[in-house]
Design a protein with these regions (language model features):
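Short, intrinsically disordered, charge-balanced linker/junction segments flanking boundaries
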Residues: 160-164
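Surface-exposed loop/turn segments and immediately adjacent short secondary-structure elements
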Residues: 1-122, 128, 132-136
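Short aromatic/hydrophobic contact patches that present stacked aromatics
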Residues: 126, 159
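Active-site palm subdomain of RNA-directed nucleic acid polymerases
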Residues: 144-158
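Active/ligand-binding-proximal structured segments within catalytic/core domains
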Residues: 141
Length: 164
């Protein structure tokens, strides 16, 4: 069963870049909007312990953990200690320009689609459970990008952007 499901999703998510030349031509002509110097510096400013602490306080509880087994409740209980540890980790990531291998790990589970026969592979969707430290870093970056998203994304394409 595991092989069948694995093969099914590998096929669905396979790299299907058949026409790279056409894509390159499009990208050469495309002139995306740019952020100004101040906006760029704001995105790239050092991560603060306050950003980390606020995110830990607001972590959802009663959610399944990633491969490391640490829950939102764990992060909240040890918030002060973990804020310092995460700040050092995130600083090291920026300094070395490299994510730890654990940031690429996820526990993948199948969630049956509602009112469908769960025994059929196409009626299940994969869900990746990531480690909380990776999710915290992702959320810090998402919060920063969100401040400038309306300038970067064309107004016709903002259907799933909050506040648009």
């Amino acid at each position: 069963m595991q092989t069948i499901i694995s093969d099914y999703y590998q096929h669905i998510y396979a790299n299907k870049m058949d026409n790279l030349e056409e894509m390159d031509q499009f990208l050469e002509k495309y002139n995306p909007p740019n952020l100004n110097q101040e906006e760029t510096e704001n995105l790239n400013r050092p991560i603060t312990s306050m950003e980390i602490e606020i995110l830990i306080k607001n972590l959802p509880t009663n959610k399944s953990p990633g491969p490391d087994g640490f829950t939102g409740e764990f992060y909240q209980k040890f918030r002060e200690e973990l804020t310092c540890i995460l700040l050092k980790l995130f600083q090291k990531i920026v300094e070395e320009d490299k994510l730890p291998n654990t940031f690429y790990e996820a526990t993948i589970t199948l969630i049956p689609k509602p009112n469908k026969d769960a025994t059929k592979k196409e009626n299940n969707r994969p869900m990746s459970l990531m480690n909380r430290d990776a999710k915290i870093l992702n959320k810090i970056q998402a919060n920063r990008i969100e401040q400038h998203i309306k300038k970067i994304i064309h107004h016709d394409k903002v259907g799933f952007i909050p506040g648009t």
